[in-house]
């Protein structure tokens, strides 16, 4: 991006981008189902102690790579070299595969609310079969161009934000007016128990507070530079944390936590709100269902093609075959997108075998999505730790405090993420075969494949090129400048 186009995003614009990237009403539902009102303080703690420092970590990487439109691959390569950069970029794409398994059933459920006014209850097998068909359709549409996707998604995202704020205001007003909440709001209910099961669910909280990697890339584009960026990120983190916490406190004003479903929980709470205020419940269900369905279907189309395109465009040529990464007339690697489809199929089928209901199925896939989502930030944190330990002399306009501060902050984050990852990968009460073949097996197979592919690529390089690829890119750039 040219300098003339830099410094064009105002503080409010960055605040809006941050909110859109991070906040989701469905995250409130998911965590309320699992840990109830204890999610309220945990959301706030996650945004303060994870989202804000992680944003600052990425902002430092962007500052280090200021002459490039940096992505995950470039950030990690600048500190750890090519192999770990490839593994990190690969995990971002790999996490997306698990994300589909939790997104697809929701799209189906909200379609039911939109067109029927209620959720048509499906078995896990039927849910998986419909998800396969829906994903095939989404892959076809996204690889053949979807020009109206952007405007539609923008409108529905705005409507979802409006609905969320409306619910908070109306539920808060009802509470102030003397309504007894369906689940009592007490200090005892909000105190976390920090059991192994609870630690596993904290990954859901961290996943909900994610999005820093899509926001921090704008550090060079904000009016006022890095100082303004830091101020806005801190304000945004506090605002999002407070909003998540308030929404979590009010989510059970009209509906009991144990009656909420992962697939249609958003509609359920609005149905309860409609019943309290005497509004037509069926119309409310259809409206919220339609908005949610449109927003999630748009998200499905976007995430079907975009991560594939980004991943295969930023990694070195030669790791994958030319036909795999070849772009079609719409600028999408269609063959790679269909390979992605074939990989997701078993990820949807395997948890179905150990699930008695669609709710059980969703619990399994959301848990694994949350566990897998810990890996990419973990690699970035390890790269940052190496940057502050061994490469802190490299010039950059922005640093997250002193060397000691940076090392201390990222070390705490690495410890928290490591425990959360283990707790969610080995959840209490889960089927042991599901854990071995799905949770552990999926990660081992996918990361093992990435390691093998990079070994083959490295073997094709000359000794000089191999040594250069292994060295931190920021160090190489400094030596050649």
For the regions a protein language model found, what residue spans apply to each?
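Membrane-interface "cap" regions at the ends of multi-pass membrane proteins
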Residues: 1-41, 45, 51-59, 65-67, ...
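C-terminal membrane-solvent junction of multi-pass transporters and transport-like membrane proteins
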Residues: 5, 327-330, 374-425
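Helix-loop-helix junctions that connect adjacent transmembrane segments
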Residues: 7, 41, 121-126, 151-289, ...
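Transmembrane helix-loop boundary segments of multi-pass membrane transporters
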Residues: 31-42, 115-124, 147-156, 347-379, ...
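Hydrophobic transmembrane alpha-helices that form the core helical bundles
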Residues: 56-60, 68-135, 140, 296-310, ...
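TM-loop-TM module centered on a large, flexible mid-protein loop between adjacent transmembrane helices
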Residues: 74-75, 81, 235-301, 320-369
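Helix-loop-helix connectors at the membrane interface of multi-pass transporters/channels
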Residues: 77, 104-127, 163, 221-225, ...
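Membrane-interface loop-to-helix entry segments
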Residues: 111, 128-180, 210, 233-238, ...
